[in-house]
């Protein structure tokens, strides 16, 4: 009977449920020089998909912001919003971005990347990439 108490405590400690992790986004961007453009890519990893690409803007006064949504049937949408946030220099500018979506369960994902250009008006939405990516 003495062994039953510690055994029950051990089983209770080992069998406690944990909350599933929620997908996360790390978004980085910056201006690049010397390249006209780069293809948009979606590269899988262990629990991650890294999307990267370039958006050309009319000047250096634009800022990029990232967002994402995981929908039903593993549909992953990465949205890159582009806003005019300052005067910048008046020449075509290449804005590189990298969006790393993490904490994804393994499986095939239908990945869509959308660019939303807010300035100058009117707002324009472009589907920049679509493909299936397998996450380990």
Predicted regions and their residues:
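Primarily secretory-pathway and cell-envelope proteins
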Residues: 15-79, 120-136
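A short tyrosine-centered beta-strand micro-motif
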Residues: 107-113
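Hydrophobic residues positioned within well-ordered beta-strands of beta-sheet architectures
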Residues: 51, 95-99, 111, 131
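An anionic, turn-rich surface loop/hairpin at beta-sheet edges
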Residues: 79-105
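Positively charged n-region of N-terminal signal peptides that target proteins for export
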Residues: 1-4
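C-terminal motif of bacterial Sec signal peptides marking the signal peptidase cleavage site
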Residues: 11-13
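Beta-strand-rich extracellular modules
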Residues: 114-118
